[in-house]
């Protein structure tokens, strides 16, 4: 904006069912957490109805199933977040003249995938504690449901080319499990409020720093 003015920005929107440009990105970022929350709430209601008469031994099966849903969520996370990083690096390489097409070099893809993996493992524990413990008390079944909802929304977003925030989707999915269990009062809404504040301030802060 500062360099070339608003007319040089591709604002976009929704074209052929896909979010494009700045407005499309903002729409995807706004809608994806809502879908995560609704998906988790509906899944929780469905699972509770199906397992109403299940034995308590189902806990072991649920925990084992989380190996699959955790892997699915990790894949969905990488499929979306790594693409965003690759896009930025490719844009820089194009501007520098290092490459001449939008096809990303393999070394860029590997470097970005490695960076996302290392960053998640090394620097994500504070966020993990907030999502896993501070929003609402989670049971194994809640974890399974929230992972399923989060992975589904994240992967669907990647398929349609929508850049979203996996952490936002996971946070809202965790809230959705609390709502689906009929325990909205037990959701720590002050923590949710702080997360929402971070969401709202992150984008303008990043834009100001870039400017």
Regions found by a protein language model. Give the residues of each.
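Multi-pass alpha-helical transmembrane bundle typical of ion/small-solute transporters
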Residues: 1-211
């Amino acid at each position: 904006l500062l360099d070339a003015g608003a007319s040089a920005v591709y604002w976009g929107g929704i074209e052929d069912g896909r979010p494009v440009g700045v407005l499309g990105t903002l729409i995807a970022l706004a809608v994806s957490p809502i879908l995560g929350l609704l998906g988790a709430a509906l899944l929780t209601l469905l699972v509770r109805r199906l397992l109403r008469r299940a034995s308590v031994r189902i806990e072991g099966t649920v925990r084992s199933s989380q190996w699959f849903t955790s892997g699915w969520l990790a894949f969905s996370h990488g499929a979306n977040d790594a693409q965003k990083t690759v896009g930025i690096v490719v844009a820089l390489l194009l501007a520098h003249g290092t490459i001449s097409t939008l096809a990303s070099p393999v070394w860029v893809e590997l470097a970005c995938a490695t960076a996302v993996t290392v960053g998640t493992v090394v620097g994500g524990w504070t966020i993990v504690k907030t999502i896993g413990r501070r929003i609402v008390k989670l049971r194994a079944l809640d974890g399974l449901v929230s992972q399923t909802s989060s992975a589904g929304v994240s992967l669907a977003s990647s398929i349609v080319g929508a850049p979203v925030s996996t952490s936002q989707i996971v946070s809202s999915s965790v809230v959705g499990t609390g709502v689906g269990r009929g325990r909205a009062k037990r959701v720590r809404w002050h923590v949710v409020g702080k997360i929402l504040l971070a969401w709202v301030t992150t984008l303008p802060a990043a834009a100001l720093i870039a400017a």
